[in-house]
Amino acid sequence: MYKHFLTSVLLVFFMLSCSKLSPFEGKMRECVQTSLSWRNDTTGIWETAGWWNSANVLTATIRYGAVTKDPAIPSVIEDVFEKARHYQVGVDSTGTPRYCDNFINDYYDDEGWWALAWIEASKLTGEKKYLDMAEIIFDDMTTGWSDACGGGIFWKKNPLHYKNSIANNLFSLTAIRLYKATQNPAYLDWFKKNVDWYMRTGMINTDIYQIEDGTKDDCTPNRNAHYTYNQGVAIAVLAEMYLHSYRMEFSAQILRNLLAAFGMSVLS
């Protein structure tokens, strides 16, 4: 099976190599070829990337497929879907292997990355099973919501621990993209509910326009850790707020200033 799959992928890449590609497409293909060479055929996961980063690599691969119409990519998506949905993510205190099923594990942010990947997979392929999986994952993410600190979801489960930017912005982003894919108003409600809470937490530091990592035990933001993925996902959420005309003036102002912190100018 592996040889057949690999042969199919290589054949498609060979066919693509015989056609004239723009320099941009050629570089993309180069990157994807290299990336696919690192994917473990048994687990479906990319070597050295680990669990949640493999979701990001898959998303990048899907976007490559959307741009280039590379016919090999749907097979890659299918292979990851079937092999990685039951995956060993570690061992417990007794040394017993721990597995995740349906891309659900002990960290809500990990789940968010996978949900977003499957939404994109559904958009590219038209396969409903990928969208169904994203909805299953999101449903589990909602179990992280609590009234502690006024709302929001936790980062970790078993036990529930730490309300932070990455888990909540991925939750909001998944909600709005599921709404766009399904038109189910419940997802829009979750999006609005969670972004309203997040905007009140102070995790968007408007003194320096950086995203704070999370909240302390007293529910105030900790102001000692800034990570680029927090900034990036927050920008994506604010862009969705703007596009959906939700708190548009506020989101435009914050988005403009966050991007300015990177030396970029938009929405002028």
Residue ranges and their predicted role:
Residues M1-P23:
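Bacterial Sec-dependent N-terminal signal peptides
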Residues S19-S268:
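Glycan-recognition and catalytic cores of secretory/periplasmic carbohydrate-active enzymes
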